[in-house]
Design a protein with these regions (language model features):
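Conserved glycine-rich
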Residues: 264-265
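Conserved micro-motifs of the catalytic ATP-binding
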Residues: 129-134, 172-175
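Short alpha-helical segment of the dimerization/phosphotransfer core of two-component systems
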Residues: 109-114
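PAS-family sensory/regulatory modules and their coupling/dimerization elements
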Residues: 1-56
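Short conserved segment of the HATPase_c
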Residues: 66, 223-235
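Conserved catalytic submotifs in the C-terminal HATPase_c
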Residues: 135-139, 157, 162-171
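Short beta-strand/loop element within the Bergerat-fold HATPase_c
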Residues: 198-210
Length: 291
């Protein structure tokens, strides 16, 4: 970038030192951002220039700005609702008890959303910075799945949603019990949220060469192709999720992805042949398992 280099030289000549960030094109037509620093030698009239590749630093800074922007946006809505409804109740403007109850429910709903978001952010931060202590050992996968399904079955009672389990042969996986429970809970809770009434959630396992694949399928509306690429991003919520009254921080699937990766597995989504979506993830087989 000759123009930037000339500018750097003129500034250094005038002030004896100068710094400038600029973009350079490499031989393969890719570009990198660099920090150019130029200083005049104390013993000679020569100028010394040092170039630092700051492409990764700029990327991290952009990610941080995006994160702060997203957090601010996501926090603003529930806080505004809580404040507006609280002010209305405090002012005594509502004489109708039923209407007051509606406002109180809105406050509670958004307070829960805020609480989930803060908890999710803290959990995600701990995972991403390696602060989550994992005790990876051989676990009975079927036992953990059954335990999670039992703890969540109350979610399907009112809407008559059932869970069907289809297991392969005996499967032990290498995982942290708390991480596995969190992954299963998040995915099965999501399946309940977006399943149609009187439908069935299917949980199945497939034995692969070195891993076990776990599939959780629902009979909801499914996820569009356009949204699939963003489904595991922080704060992303599908159009259907935004249209419902379900609480959600948009962090659950981001946590799932990070936890699965921490356990040396993979995670993804695919559409069902009939209706709904299938979330899948893999975990390493326990070494004692037969191939």
């Amino acid at each position: 970038n000759i123009k930037s280099m000339n500018y750097l030289y003129r500034r250094a000549k005038k002030k004896k030192n100068a710094d400038i960030e600029f973009e350079v094109e490499l031989g393969d037509r890719s570009t990198r951002w660099v920090l150019g620093s130029m200083n005049q030698s104390k013993t000679t009239k020569e100028f010394i220039m040092v170039i630092h590749d700051i492409s990764q630093l700029r990327k991290l800074n952009q990610m941080r700005r995006d994160f702060v922007s997203n957090v601010s946006h996501e926090l603003r809505t529930p806080v505004s609702v809580i404040r507006a409804n609280s002010e209305t109740l405090v002012d005594g403007a509502l004489q109708d008890q039923k209407q007051a109850k509606v406002f109180a429910k809105a406050i509670l709903h958004n307070a829960e959303r805020l609480s989930d978001m803060v908890k999710g952010l803290l959990d995600l931060s701990r995972i991403e910075y390696g602060e989550l202590k994992l005790n990876i050992k051989s676990l009975d996968l079927f036992q953990e799945i059954d335990k999670t399904i039992e703890s969540l079955k109350h979610l399907g009672k009112k809407r008559n949603i059932k869970v069907e389990v289809i297991y392969s042969k005996k499967a032990n996986v290498m995982a942290d019990i708390n991480a596995l429970e969190r992954i299963l809970t998040n995915l099965i809770e999501n399946a309940y949220k977006y399943s149609d009434d009187d439908s069935t959630i299917k949980v199945s396992t497939i034995k692969l060469k070195d891993h076990i694949e776990i599939n959780i399928s629902d009979q909801g509306k499914g996820i569009s192709e356009d949204e699939k690429g963003f489904i595991f991003d922080r704060f992303f919520r599908t159009a259907e999720a935004r249209a419902t009254e379900e609480t959600g921080s948009g962090l659950g699937l981001a946590i799932v992805k990070n936890l699965v990766n921490s356990l040396n597995g993979e995670v993804g989504i695919k559409n069902s042949d009939s209706q709904g979506s299938i979330f899948w993830f893999t975990l390493p087989k326990a070494k004692s398992m037969d191939n």
